[in-house]
């Protein structure tokens, strides 16, 4: 049996919206393809390398927890950036997405330094962008989830897709997330992967390609995931009509 290793960073601080469900989805989806997933929880980064890592995951947290996580992850920002540039798949949620950028501006105007992995920034406001969200993606098809964030993120990189219902990165450009090489960043909770198996398969497939192990096409029953996604799409459509 082939194996993949996931590094789950700052799991003790960044799991505000049960984002651990994304790890469970990756593990279960891989199991259906006879791939064993080993999850390494990393809360202290001193001396950490990415030599044994195939996928990394960073969840979301409060502003306070995010600041603590940023400080800890800054110790490995150079190898993290190198891994991303080398094509390592990664999924970052909300705060985990925000602090990959250069800065985070609080509602009172205070600028907090990010990891600076990529050239973008986030500005937080007191009113939050909350509710169901539906996205149309050239790569993943229809994506659904739930968003709840005060941050407005701005960048010129590729995105997960176009927002057809909800807000996304901000309340202006109708774009959601970031898609840079094999790095995915998003504001979608839910968690995102159980309802969007296409993204789960993407991360696993890219990890297998990079490691040189087969990711063979296999008939998998996706009916439960499809039905769950349709429930959110239908609910969003009803909300559209009532506005």
UniProtKB/Swiss-Prot annotation:
The active site is at residues 94, 189. It comes from the Bacteria. GO terms for molecular function: carbon-nitrogen ligase activity on lipid II; glutaminase activity. One of its GO terms (biological process) is cell wall organization. Keywords: Cell shape, Cell wall biogenesis/degradation, Glutamine amidotransferase, Hydrolase, Ligase, Peptidoglycan synthesis. Substrate binds at residue 128. Disruption phenotype: The gatD-murT double mutant shows abnormal peptidoglycan composition, with decreased amidation of the glutamate residue. The mutant has a normal morphology but growth rate is greatly reduced. Mutant shows reduced antibiotic resistance and increased sensitivity to lysozyme. PROSITE patterns: GATASE_COBBQ. Changing residue 189 to A: Abolishes glutaminase activity. CDD domains: GATase1_CobQ. SUPFAM superfamilies: Class I glutamine amidotransferase-like. Pathway: Cell wall biogenesis; peptidoglycan biosynthesis. Residues 6-197 form the GATase cobBQ-type domain. Its EC number is 6.3.5.13, 3.5.1.2. It catalyses: beta-D-GlcNAc-(1->4)-Mur2Ac(oyl-L-Ala-gamma-D-Glu-L-Lys-D-Ala-D-Ala)-di-trans,octa-cis-undecaprenyl diphosphate + L-glutamine + ATP + H2O = beta-D-GlcNAc-(1->4)-Mur2Ac(oyl-L-Ala-D-isoglutaminyl-L-Lys-D-Ala-D-Ala)-di-trans,octa-cis-undecaprenyl diphosphate + L-glutamate + ADP + phosphate + H(+); L-glutamine + H2O = L-glutamate + NH4(+). Changing residue 94 to A: Abolishes glutaminase activity. Changing residue 128 to A: Abolishes glutaminase activity. The lipid II isoglutaminyl synthase complex catalyzes the formation of alpha-D-isoglutamine in the cell wall lipid II stem peptide. The GatD subunit catalyzes the hydrolysis of glutamine to glutamate and ammonia. The resulting ammonia molecule is channeled to the active site of MurT. Forms a heterodimer with MurT. Belongs to the CobB/CobQ family. GatD subfamily. This is Lipid II isoglutaminyl synthase (glutamine-hydrolyzing) subunit GatD. It comes from Staphylococcus aureus (strain COL).
């Amino acid at each position: 049996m082939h194996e993949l290793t996931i590094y789950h960073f700052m799991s003790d601080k960044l799991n505000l919206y049960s984002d651990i469900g994304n790890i469970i989805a990756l593990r279960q989806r891989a199991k259906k393809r006879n791939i064993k997933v080993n999850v390494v929880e990393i809360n202290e980064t001193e001396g950490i390398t990415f030599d044994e890592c195939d996928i990394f995951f960073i969840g979301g947290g409060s502003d306070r927890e995010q600041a603590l996580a940023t400080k800890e992850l800054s110790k490995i920002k150079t190898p993290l950036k190198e891994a991303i540039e080398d094509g390592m798949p990664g999924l970052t949620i909300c705060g985990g997405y925000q602090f990959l950028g250069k800065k985070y501006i609080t509602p009172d105007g205070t600028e907090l330094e990010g990891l600076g992995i990529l050239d973008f920034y986030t500005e937080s406001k007191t009113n939050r962008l909350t509710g169901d969200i539906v996205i149309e993606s050239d790569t993943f098809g229809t994506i659904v989830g739930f968003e709840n964030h005060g941050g407005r993120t701005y960048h010129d990189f590729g995105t997960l897709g176009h927002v057809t219902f909800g807000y996304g990165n901000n309340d202006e450009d109708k774009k959601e997330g970031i898609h840079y090489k094999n790095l995915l960043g998003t504001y979608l909770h839910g968690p995102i992967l159980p309802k969007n198996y296409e993204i789960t398969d993407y991360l696993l497939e890219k990890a297998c390609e990079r490691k040189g192990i087969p990711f063979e096409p296999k008939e998998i029953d996706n009916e439960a995931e499809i039905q769950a996604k349709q429930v959110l799409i239908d609910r969003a459509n009803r909300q559209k009509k009532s506005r």
